[in-house]
Amino acid sequence: MSMTPREIVHELNRHIIGQDDAKRAVAIALRNRWRRMQLPAELRAEVTPKNILMIGPTGVGKTEIARRLAKLANAPFLKVEATKFTEVGYVGRDVESIIRDLADAALKMLREQEIIRVRHRAEDAAEDRILDALLPQARVTSFSEEAAQTSSDSNTRQLFRKRLREGQLDDKEIEIEVADAVGVEIAAPPGMEEMTNQLQSLFANMGKGKRKARKLKVKEALKMVRDEEASRLVNEEELKAKALEAVEQHGIVFIDEIDKVAKRGNVGGADVSREGVQRDLLPLIEGCTVNTKLGMVKTDHILFIASGAFHLSKPSDLVPELQGRLPIRVELKALTPEDFERILQEPHASLTEQYQALLKTEGLNIEFLADGIKRLAEIAYQVNEKTENIGARRLHTLLERLLEEVSFSAGDLASTHDEAPIQIDAAYVNSHLGELAQNEDLSRYIL
């Protein structure tokens, strides 16, 4: 990760409006991963990541920051919901499965990168196998015949290779030997994922090396053989060693909905495993060793980012030890009408841009005017204030409602409007959403 914090924030700004403090915090944390790797080995072992707690209402960009960060980081990344886990001893997933899933994600990411690296060699090998199936070797009886045959075969082979690359042979059917995949689906109760993975690996290895002849069209066969050749060129043991190092040194875990496992004040109840989940998370965040399919993974240098709305609880309701392990606190602000206005226009592939592109597929043009966008932003803010504040997600509901009629009759409208776009202005927004926004009972159930 060689991007500077400023470059990371700039990239996040393309997709997320506002929340500068949160962007700066994650940008610094991400850059510190790179800085740490430049240190001498002795000092590097002592530098631990500063974990982050993001606090803010729902729909303001916490999860979106995590999603975009995953794409930027080019590092093993996993997003989990804290509510999915239970205390050890209860039915459900235990928190150690977070690291096992992160290890799987790292292996998958590195395998994809390695397959891209060997792709050209795999394509050449796959083409040769397809050509062998298309052009069986003729039998020869003398050396002179063999020389003439070789020259003729070489010319024919080059001609067929050219036709294969141009796609002229795609629909031709051939018989070819491919690996016989052994797929075993094992249904297991929650919490037994590790045993299930081991059993699946065992059955997969038992079937390794088995081959079977199949009749396929050239296009399908080429893809199957290319994947097979790429897998053969990838060194699995080396890949596992790299993945293990990537998890330990660069891994990032985003734990969403952390507030849902916080004990709410002095409220008692039957949900005994809430605090247990927090206590199980402690050693994971502090640093422990977890057994995974890659081997033993040390979690000392994995970066943890936790987030929660904290509507019904406060960060201080988390157990004190967990609070101490999330030293960087970032508060995300609730969205204003101006933020809603910017969200509708500024991000890369904004909501308005998406709807325009979707309707364009049917030949219908729609145009969002400035006053229409402003009115839409105001209604989103008003409905959030009057009912539940769900942040930017309110815009999805409003836009679906606003364009419902247009989406339903897009094909008919395209033929009547020709090239002239349907203009979405303030009057259009008021006529479709005004009454619903004013009537609190209706907006509570419909918007």
Swiss-Prot record:
The keyword ATP-binding applies. One of its GO terms (molecular function) is proteasome-activating activity. GO terms for cellular component: HslUV protease complex. It is found in: Cytoplasm. ATP binds at residues 17, 59-64, 256, 321, 393. Its main location: cytoplasm. A double ring-shaped homohexamer of HslV is capped on each side by a ring-shaped HslU homohexamer. The assembly of the HslU/HslV complex is dependent on binding of ATP. This is ATP-dependent protease ATPase subunit HslU. It comes from Pseudomonas putida (strain ATCC 700007 / DSM 6899 / JCM 31910 / BCRC 17059 / LMG 24140 / F1).
